[in-house]
Amino acid sequence: MKHLLRGLFIAVLFICCNFQLVLAQPMQELPVDKNVRIGKLDNGLTYYIRHNALPEKRVEFYIAQKVGSILEEPQQRGLAHFLEHMAFNGTKHFPGDETGLGIVPWCETKGIKFGTNLNAYTSVDQTVYNISNVPTENINVVDSCLLILHDWSSAINLADKEIDKERGVIREEWRSRNSGMLRIMTDAQSTLYPDSKYSDCMPIGSIDVINNFPYQDIRDYYAKWYRPDLQGIVIVGDINVDEIEAKLKKVFADVKAPVNPAERIYYPVADNQEPLIYIGTDKEVKNPYVNIFFKQDATPDSLKNTIAYYATQYMVSMAMNMLNNRLNELRQTANPPFTSASAEYGNYFLAKTKEALALDASSKIDGIDLAMKTVLEEAERARRFGFTASEYERARANYLQAVE
């Protein structure tokens, strides 16, 4: 299985001769942008601050948590995502009751629109909140955004009444997302990840848990995982870096370092000797669709700031671009072998501890065998015979245009 990706990599390397010089010093690290202020507080919180003059008089705030649905216990299925919702429903400095405005109404009085400039997402391995396009003319607005980050970090109220109100919101979101394809994807997890924590970790969770979990369960998750050693603050914009750093240190000074913190485990995905095969059906999914994964070990984080890693990522990107161009040309023929097809390299479905080359294809009702055969043949053709110089120049031009 691994030979297919390696062959595609080599096929690009033959065209990109200069990369052989780049890879001669594979472990050389790329320098950190000297304009980024990086620091760590005594409680373990890491921060990154950078001045960026464009757009003028605007700043972006992020708090990233190295936690997601993979860390839930069975009785907490869906609570990582539920907690993300609760972060907008009352905090220490923005209670959202008779004593003061909540985060959403306060932000909207400053032109920061919920869902556009004020948002968050929960994935399997991380949860990220952002306040974007914040005007900097009024320093009190900037200071208040720091307080919002502080409250998300350690001071979400999680009041009983607000939890019960949010159950209905989550139920509606669950209902609207509960498509046939999502049901198939969820059902496939136990096959893709046998005997693994990844076998049941979709962020939307279990509707039974959402309806019935005791209040303390979400408070336990919050206390266990939302902690400074697993959090990072990113602030970028038209700001004075020294002033923002000093304010951040002051605002987050009362956030305590955890005592005997739980280990943040990154769960492995086992290799398999024989192919893992899942076949699923759903009345809402009318046309067949096939995904084929070629797994390999993920790149360690310690290597992701090296020249070799970035060179490799570029070559993989070129290989995927050129292979997708070929698949797209086949789709546009008079009698295409599929209705859609693509190739992509990245995380193995939900898992970040395994990577995979993914080949996808969809077809008419009776055409899935031909669709699968064709995408496999095209990938193998590229592995054996490589790509042409003209294909590479086209892919390179697309890449440079996207970067610009």
Regions found by a protein language model. Give the residues of each.
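Non-catalytic, conformational "gating/processing" segments within enzyme and secreted inhibitor domains
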Residues: 167, 181, 216-250
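M16/insulysin-pitrilysin zinc metalloprotease superfamily fold
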Residues: 90, 131-166, 330, 348-404
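Histidine-acidic residue clusters that define the catalytic metal-binding segment
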Residues: 25-37, 129-132, 139, 147, ...
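An aromatic/glycine/proline-enriched structural segment found at the starts
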Residues: 195, 232-291, 397, 401-403
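M16/MPP (pitrilysin/insulinase) zinc-metallopeptidase core fold and M16-derived inactive scaffolds
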Residues: 60-132, 183-184, 200-206, 321-355
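Acidic/histidine-enriched alpha-helical segments
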Residues: 99-105, 157-175, 186, 240, ...
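His/Glu-based metal-binding/catalytic segments typifying zinc-dependent metallopeptidases
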Residues: 260-327, 360
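Bacterial Sec-dependent N-terminal signal peptides
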Residues: 1-26
